[in-house]
């Protein structure tokens, strides 16, 4: 079962991940990333579109430990939940889904982020 993480709880989750660096995996398409994006602040921000992840999984596994704290992000939280489940099926044990996606992040954390 993948935990749902609200944007307002992200800072506490990130702090709890220490000393490991948390990863935010943004699975949106490149045009979406250009429209609206969060800024890496004490975490690694990684962009791999959902459809590209299977082909990049071997590299992803080499670069990230199975217990690496990973929060998956998309527009509304649906694609990211699918990716979170995919990562869990591939042995990642500290995966959460950013509930509501970047839309919720813009509404609850950073209103300067464009909404689309």
Language model feature labels by segment:
Residues 1-23, 27-70, 78-116:
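Rhodanese-like catalytic fold shared by cysteine-dependent sulfurtransferases
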Residues 74:
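Short cysteine clusters
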